[in-house]
């Protein structure tokens, strides 16, 4: 165990065998090319599956749309940033000179949270990282009140509208990324092949841009008479 990380290991509830994985998971691209971005990509997928599985098993009467809505709530940026802060990840993030002061930024915390999950997965196995994730999420999952889950995020709402009308889901892609690291603007394009629609919007993160793109597509569908069925 690397001494300076012993406290962090205790907070995470996991001891890394290969500490270089953890260091990379904590390193922002403003510091070096060997940063957390690839681990973030991996961790995002691992987290999404673990949460989907636990919700599927715990809420056996929920329809697919409600499960998707609930998962979106649990893996959204704000939730991940809050969990990262509670695990003191902000105290260990490694930033370059251009990003100093960014330890508390929601986007960076969200990315690091997913990257640490990716690092734990590579350092161990799926069963281990699943156990760690569920420990972190236990207070949130145990406090879920289905009666209070009313507001859908735009991507989930769009998904329900399309599925209810037997239409394929849109494909999201990044068109451009403008600005410096700490003030980037993402332009995302959403394409619905079945409806021959192409919509774009901007946001300060990919996820925010995707949500705005979904909002625009919902408005266009509404004009065509396609609404969410209650």
Swiss-Prot record:
- Alphabetical list of InterPro entries matching this protein: dsRBD_dom (IPR014720), RNase_III (IPR011907), RNase_III_dom (IPR000999), RNase_III_sf (IPR036389)
The residue ranges of the RNase III domain are: 5-125
User: What top-level branch of life does the organism fall under?
Assistant: Bacteria
Enzyme class, first EC level, given as a word? hydrolase
Protein location: Cytoplasm
Q: Which residues form the active site?
A: 44, 114
Q: From the UniProt record, which GO molecular function terms apply?
A: double-stranded RNA binding; metal ion binding; ribonuclease III activity; rRNA binding
Q: One biological-process term from Gene Ontology?
A: tRNA processing
Residues engaged in binding Mg(2+): 40, 111, 114
Where is it mainly found? cytoplasm
Q: NCBIfam families this protein is in?
A: RNaseIII (TIGR02191)
User: What is the name listed in the Swiss-Prot or TrEMBL entry for this protein?
Assistant: Ribonuclease 3
Q: Quick one: which gene encodes this?
A: rnc
